[in-house]
Amino acid sequence: MAENQYYGTGRRKSSTARVFIKPGNGKIVINQRSLEQYFGRETARMVVRQPLELVDMVEKLDLYITVKGGGISGQAGAIRHGITRALMEYDESLRSELRKAGFVTRDARQVERKKVGLRKARRRPQFSKR
């Protein structure tokens, strides 16, 4: 693509996002669709924009993103993590600000597995006294 582009990989739950950043005018493309087309929920769009708004670069950078796996919330979180990593590659001085906001740390929470003899991960079958 361009010679001055920056890359970041983001992960959250079972989603993985590859984020490419280059100087531009604020266009965000996710899986060949615009941010508004890809995420119907306003909260997901807000999560994606958070790192850019924090460092005031919403209108200065173009983002090209491919994201796979998981659901809407997981994908939004993965994109946010990827954007954060790409921004740090773009300008290392942004790291402390992004870390303070909590965007640098990967959210390691995963779905707990279902156990044998239980209905879900922790939900036990109903107990009947008699």
Curated annotation (Swiss-Prot):
Q: Which GO terms describe its cellular component?
A: cytosolic small ribosomal subunit
Query: What is one process in the GO biological process aspect for this record?
Result: translation
Q: Which InterPro entries match?
A: Ribosomal_Su5_D2-typ_SF (IPR020568), Ribosomal_uS9 (IPR000754), Ribosomal_uS9_bac/plastid (IPR023035), Ribosomal_uS9_CS (IPR020574), Ribsml_uS5_D2-typ_fold_subgr (IPR014721)
UniProt keyword ATP-binding present: no
Keywords attached to this entry: Ribonucleoprotein, Ribosomal protein
Q: Name one Pfam family in it.
A: Ribosomal_S9
Q: Which family, according to UniProt?
A: Belongs to the universal ribosomal protein uS9 family.
Protein name (database record): Small ribosomal subunit protein uS9
Task: State a single Gene Ontology molecular function.
Answer: structural constituent of ribosome
Entry-linked HAMAP family = Ribosomal_uS9_B (MF_00532_B)
